[in-house]
Amino acid sequence: MQDSLKLLRRHWEELSRRCVFPEQRSQAVFQLLLQAYAEPQRHYHTLQHIAECLALYSQIQHLLDDAPSLALALWFHDAVYDPQAPDNEERSAALMMQACAGLLSDAQLRKVSAWIAATKLHLCADESDLQYLL
């Protein structure tokens, strides 16, 4: 798990540099995500799942129009997980909006939020980047 955590940290730091996140805020958001994905009720939606998603992302990021937005959507798409709740995706999108407020443009916040919400139904998407997420 330690190697996986190092890999996750490296991915996050690279994304933070690309998005020009201030160091202190970047670390706070990263810690928020680590805590969320380590919650005890999780069995599939864990840090291992995010590591697997990011491994696939690394293989296709050169094909994306907006790689940073897709990476953020991957990081946050299961950040809120209550097995009994019907609105995990919406709550994950809201968490991203709150955590990244002031770090991203309003347009990018809306895009990433919409992409996270789209993971609820996994319907076909018109946007090519979103197709990779789904």
Please state what every model-predicted region is:
Residues 41-49, 81-91, 106:
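Active-site metal-coordination segments of metallo-dependent hydrolases
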Residues 26-29, 66-72, 103-116:
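Acidic/histidine metal-binding catalytic segments
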